[in-house]
Curated annotation (Swiss-Prot):
SUPFAM superfamilies named among the record's database cross-references: F1F0 ATP synthase subunit B, membrane domain
Quaternary state and interactors: F-type ATPases have 2 components, F(1) - the catalytic core - and F(0) - the membrane proton channel. F(1) has five subunits: alpha(3), beta(3), gamma(1), delta(1), epsilon(1). F(0) has three main subunits: a(1), b(2) and c(10-14). The alpha and beta chains form an alternating ring which encloses part of the gamma chain. F(1) is attached to F(0) by a central stalk formed by the gamma and epsilon chains, while a peripheral stalk is formed by the delta and b chains.
UniProt-listed Gene3D superfamilies: F1F0 ATP synthase subunit B, membrane domain
Transmembrane segments: 7-27
Organism: Albidiferax ferrireducens (strain ATCC BAA-621 / DSM 15236 / T118) (Rhodoferax ferrireducens)
The keyword Cytoplasm appears for this protein: no
Membrane topology reported for the UniProt record: Single-pass membrane protein
Protein name: ATP synthase subunit b 1
Length: 156
């Protein structure tokens, strides 16, 4: 191998090529690579942020669902209590109404019983007068003996 001037010339051309590449070609390539790396890093950061937002949204949804379930349970329990109170109120009103009806029936029965007793007393008094009249064979004046007949009614 002969070392001659072409080898030196080729070395100089190669050095110029390296310098030209380092000065004009390499910076846009590194800039493009850096931009691409930044885009990838931004995308990964956005993905992580979206993932954390999704996680927090899921937690909020779960909290809302739990709150909704609690409210629904409370409303159902409240409705059940209201239903029970309405039923109890209806029962008490029905019992009260039945007691009123029974009391009215007792009062009416007592009045009818008293009326029947009075009618019977009058009939017994009339029968007693007729019986006494027949026994004595003498007419008895009812107006004269009203006091006697009144006592007789009370005794009966």
């Amino acid at each position: 191998m002969n070392i001659n001037s072409t080898l030196f010339l080729q070395a100089i051309v190669f050095a110029i090529l390296v310098w030209f590449t380092m000065k004009f070609v390499w910076p846009p390539i590194t800039k493009a690579l850096d931009e691409r790396a930044q885009k990838i890093a931004d995308g990964l950061a956005a993905a992580d942020k979206a993932k954390s937002e999704l996680s927090s949204a899921n937690k909020r949804v779960e909290a809302e669902l739990a709150l909704s379930r609690t409210e629904t349970t409370a409303r159902l329990a409240d409705a059940d209590r209201r239903g029970q109170s309405i039923v109890e109120e209806a029962k008490s009103k029905a019992t009260e109404e039945a007691n009123k009806i029974i009391a009215a029936a007792k009062v009416e029965a007592e009045q009818q019983s008293n009326k029947a007793r009075e009618v019977l007393r009058e009939q017994v008094a009339a029968l007693a007068v007729k019986g006494a009249e027949q026994i004595l064979r003498k007419e008895v004046n009812a107006s004269v003996h009203a006091d006697l007949l009144g006592r007789l009614k009370l005794e009966l």
